[in-house]
């Protein structure tokens, strides 16, 4: 679930150099990166003073950084559907995490982003979370890499319970598993291999990273880079949600998402912030 202040970040990277494109007049290779629930807590956006995102920062320096971002809907499925189909939620009718967009009548005549590239002579690839869940529209991609949930699955919970005893997806903390077993590591490695093949046909590759979506799990090494006692907490205004419409407060009251008061009263607020930053 995507919080109201979160956004789906898409970074288009032209893998071929501009000079090469200008001389040879060849179509550029395109890499699309979707990062689930990433807000402005990255170095180049300055959302949190302790955020460390050297790779995103280098990418921003090489291209154009759009810093005034808006999500089409504050939840996964409608936001991703809007981006991949080019149709806003008010036109598609997709407002929640179901149904799957390729089953929606209003989208039957829409051409998805990968199909558009395919029609222009591109070979299309994907790995990780691009659409909501692990499903994909039939025929969207020529080659499909690792899918969400196919690699490391962590069953041991670090936080025994949250609000109302609900567990859901809300858990956080460092994990001692080997870093190369984490899903995002697997997806990135697969994408790098595809890019390095350098085929004659131009490619469009969409890679979706699951973190920092809940649960906020990261390798222990990364988690410990910013000790909890040094964490700077964000400013939270009293009554900040008082002017929100009912649907927004209903989403934030879902049992899987504990209220802010739980983090404060349980003394886990700094640890949760630490975990999010580690996932970034």
Residue ranges and their predicted role:
Residues 1-4:
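N-terminal secretory signal peptides that target proteins for export/translocation
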Residues 7-18:
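Bacterial N-terminal signal peptides
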Residues 22-280:
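Formylglycine-dependent sulfatase
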């Amino acid at each position: 679930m995507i919080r109201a202040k979160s956004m789906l970040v898409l970074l288009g990277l032209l893998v071929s150099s501009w000079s090469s494109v200008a001389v040879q007049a060849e179509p550029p290779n395109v890499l699309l990166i979707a990062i689930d629930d990433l807000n402005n807590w990255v170095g180049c956006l300055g959302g949190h003073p302790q955020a460390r995102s050297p790779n995103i920062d280098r990418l921003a320096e090489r291209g154009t950084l759009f810093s005034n971002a808006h999500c089409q809907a504050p939840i996964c499925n409608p936001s991703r559907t809007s981006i991949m189909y080019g149709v806003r939620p008010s036109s598609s009718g997709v407002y929640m995490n179901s149904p799957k967009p390729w089953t929606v009548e209003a989208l039957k005549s829409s051409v998805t982003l990968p199909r558009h590239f395919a029609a222009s002579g591109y070979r299309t690839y994907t790995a990780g979370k691009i659409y909501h869940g692990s499903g994909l529209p039939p025929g969207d991609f020529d080659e499909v890499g690792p899918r969400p949930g196919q690699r490391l699955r962590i069953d041991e919970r670090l936080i025994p319970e949250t609000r109302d005893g609900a567990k859901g997806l809300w858990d956080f903390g460092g994990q001692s598993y080997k870093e190369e077993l984490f899903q995002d590591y697997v997806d990135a490695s697969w994408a790098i291999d595809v890019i390095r093949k350098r085929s004659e046909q131009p490619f469009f590759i969409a890679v979706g990273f699951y973190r920092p979506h809940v649960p906020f799990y990261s390798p222990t090494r990364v988690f410990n880079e910013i000790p909890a006692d040094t964490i700077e907490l964000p400013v939270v205004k009293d009554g900040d949600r008082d002017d929100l419409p009912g649907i927004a407060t209903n989403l934030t009251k879902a049992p899987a998402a504990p209220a802010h008061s739980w983090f404060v009263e349980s003394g886990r607020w700094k640890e949760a912030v630490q975990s999010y930053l580690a996932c970034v």
